[in-house]
Amino acid sequence: MPQSRSSASTWFIFALLVVTCSYSAGQTRAWLTHSHDAQHTGVSSVASQPLSKIHWKQRVDFAVPSGEIFIHYGSPLVTARNTVIVPVKAGSDSFRIVAHNGTTGAILWRQSTGYQAPFAAFLPGMGPTLFGRKLFIPDNGGRVIVRQDPDLSSGVVSELYFYGQKNFQSDPLAYKQTVQINTPLTADTHGNLYFGFLANGSTPIGLQSGLARIAANGTGTWASAAFLSGDPFITEISMSCAPALSPDGKILYVAVSSGDFGYGYLLALNSTNLSVINRVRLTDPASAFDATMSDESSASPTVGPDGDVYYGVLENPFPFHNDRGWLLHFNRDLSQQKIPGSFGWDDTASIVDASLVPSYRGTSAYLLMTKYNNYAGISSDDGHNRVAILDPNASENDPVMPSTQVMQEVITQLGVTPDPGFPTFPGAVREWCINTAAVDPFTKSVIVNSEDGKLYRWDLTSNTLSEVIKLSGGIGEAYTPTVIGSDGTVFAINDAVLDAIGR
């Protein structure tokens, strides 16, 4: 929902395999983290099943508010052996993990956690991650729960502390009351963990809100957001911004901000010691003012197979770009700003091999899939909500501000369900409800969720919505992810329920 409420192809496929390759042969079918992998490509390594039938369901919220749902639910994960890891909001601000057999939906185990979501108008979700035979889960006090063997009904559980176990044990209450993880967890190919945290008060060792790294051997380090940005007014790692890694794992990307509706930077850091490689202050490509950073966004950096980095922000002045924001675009070390996309609000772009779109006649090896809503009732927008495939290396006039050059539209798809909330806007349709979309290169399609309560397959070969299944009656809600499991089951969240869909 809007804030106001060829050889080139061969190279691409090789590079994408490098990006999404697993840490062992057994990981190749897994959905490991937010947007699939540490580059947030959203590209499945398994062909999705047809959207024919709902196999099973799991509530992801046992304290659903009345009316619209201003909550970001954490992405489900799927192991290579088809265990589905579901973050569940158990109360008004309490969470747990529920693990299911991916085929039958049978519950295998539950894991409690003391994690509490940081305050934001759109409540942030809890974002676990998988590495090897370990599941990492956010806990309170900035701690991370480690559960061994998540495919088994029981597993050894331990804790990690980025600031040291002895420090925690010296004053547990001080850390539990003040330190909160505020992003999904990201693991690299060696099992090192990265995440943002808030320090909302004093601790014995003087923690300040920033970025944590826990090495595979359990040792931790951290750096404050103010220090990393070189700006004393920067107060946090951007809310819900999952850190991303370059294809070779050497560079870590994360955004920082001065708080809700403030300004911010995108950082490129040495992934081993968190030293700054580069930082860039994020600006609106039309006005050249500071871009608006919103705590209600779940946008995270996407890293392309060529190393280019994409990150979504809101416009400034707001909402002069019709609450669409911008998808900012940089080279690997952030030294060059490239063509922006015309939509960036609460969206993590997915990577699409150019060969999946037969109508494409350009030269880019890969394209981007993004939300492309056109919110009715906001500035000059008309309610013609779309999703889009964009060429990151070709430009055209922006559809809202023609004087600004943006990524060229390759194909777009208009929503299908009329929006009764906007009867005075001809052709207005319900929003696409997606913050990270699963791309299926085997069926050449993208799995997209809508606020009309339906899940769609967008066929990129014909530019049609070739399959649809009803999940709910439709509701306005904070944007949600889609996922493809290790047996091809499709997962989507609609009206606070996770549905498992397949043949």
State where each predicted segment sits.
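Bacterial N-terminal signal peptides
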Residues: 11-22
